[in-house]
């Protein structure tokens, strides 16, 4: 049999040759170089020693230094190995028997009393791979009861030193036994790492199930062993292939030799590489899964244990074209859960950075004080809302407004009878619906102003609906009572039809006749407001952290981002750290509506604050927090969340919408860059411009923002074809004008919303295809057809209606059906050419390209008129 060199063993095991030499010398082999060769049995022993870190039985006598004291190896185990060797090597049977007898005599002389204890230890020794697999397959385990009083002690003896390296046949284990023991040891070590084994080691010990046990005579009370099912064995687990991979150097050595420890020898390994077996992973059933309200496709797939492609294909089958980064709405999540058969629990991920939800209002009754009421004035445009507030404030706001209409939300403080009242003035124009809705949502009482001479108008109805939706009390102020055409009864009747019944008519709504010009009824109106506020019992805690609503925000030169706020709870002071949506910062300065500096704003009061990092959205809730770090974290999380959501929306489209998108691609668009002075006006303008569209044209707002027109806006406009820059209540500076002139960018600025919308409508109308209409000119009857050589047919006609013009478009009509359309090629009156022939005259008409004229046909003359389209 071929010997195996040390470097081959090192290569097979992936070790350095020096390490293999050291391990071999530890076994007493005396290896000096990597080229030294050893027998296959010794190579197998080295392999076992390196893998298990345990010295093989056959080499214990070869070690010169005394080993650590260990219990003596069992005699029964050696006998089993010898018996197995006898079966597999019948030729060496006689020799093995003699050696077994000698070994037995030695064991009996050494210690005959240890036989019983050795049998007990035998149960703990590593079993062969076949035994372990079979016991696992049967699913049973023999449990040995614990007895604290019995402690098994094994006598130890010193191993005799031996200088001669002689490996007897009884000490040479077969390759199969060696590797089965080594593999079993590794397998046992791996099992010990698993968590479920730790709990079993406390009370049970596995016995050799293949040994002979009389299970029929087992008693649970008297006996030490109990047969129990082994729950660590899976029922569905299939027995794995017992064959283990052997080292290449063993296969090379015994490849051609039959009968070495195996019946029939070892089969030659095929050169063909075995096909890789793909282990089928057990699909775990997913129970109830927590899914965030806003989740991307790939995140949803990870949550439910599916591949992203599988989820996308399912969405495609449901009619949704998505990418893995798109967000899923609640309906899509529920449909997918039903398709995959998964129970889900939808949670709102935005709660993690919902600073409003985290805000804790202290409700200690001792700290609650009466706060100022917040009153919102609403109504139709030009019904006198701002004029009424001007009289109350003794100011002239209305006279300074562009176009005589309010285009911003204003907050003002008024003191009446030593009590403060906060007023919010909202625009009445239809474009400012969102502003009115915000005003109604943060107010305590709503005053609806109706002109006595004009009655209920569309925005009046809308304001009433906003107030009802907010659930706040309504007071009706009938304005312009000083006019001769004033008719308050008409107003009451119209409002009664909307279920706004006056108190004097048996209803529950207060009606007050006022005049913003003369001051009539103003005192009565304020008295009713304070009375209503007392009924509501408006209270707040001024000692807690501030909570306020932003009703308007803008950028002011020299001050940066400013915001008009109304404090709802707590006290907002200079130096407070605040967060509002994506904006955060420390309040650097505060002022009232008159521009007077303030140190604090109490509940129910309004003011203007400076110090935010950016322009906050109108309608956001502003909260005071403890630290700047906390405010920054809230704002950054909100910014990232909104950004990801916006990016996702730009890509998501359903199959049903795809056709509309393709059709929309044929639309002509007017690219617009929109800048305004405040956030509320910008919001209103965007909403109004987006409504200016039809099947042919639309407005495309490529950028919008609060503040003045900058050079970056000009650069963006120059990069976009045919785009214009629209400014509302702002003016470009000299540098910006020069840059726009150089780039050929047109800038238009306005201070009245009517004018801006009208100009955009005109621009859109110029881009639309003109409307083509027909204008009938005349009609002639053909009475004779003359064929002229080289020219064709000439029709002799009588003009019966209007005139026939040379070069005009004509239709040839036969029996009421148009048979030809073309142009007049020649027109003559007798022999002379004519430009036109009027009704009642005869003429000769030549039609270009027509040779099928008949007597009795009619020639109809017309012209096409183009009209400019408008929205």
Swiss-Prot record:
Binding site for GTP: 379-386, 425-429, 479-482
Main location: cytoplasm
Domain tr-type G: 370-537
UniProt-listed SUPFAM superfamilies: Initiation factor IF2/eIF5b, domain 3, P-loop containing nucleoside triphosphate hydrolases, Translation proteins
Region (G1): 379-386
Stretches with biased composition (Basic and acidic residues): 73-101
Free-text function comment from the UniProt entry: One of the essential components for the initiation of protein synthesis. Protects formylmethionyl-tRNA from spontaneous hydrolysis and promotes its binding to the 30S ribosomal subunits. Also involved in the hydrolysis of GTP during the formation of the 70S ribosomal complex.
Protein name (Swiss-Prot/TrEMBL): Translation initiation factor IF-2
Origin species: Campylobacter jejuni subsp. jejuni serotype O:2 (strain ATCC 700819 / NCTC 11168)
Gene label: infB
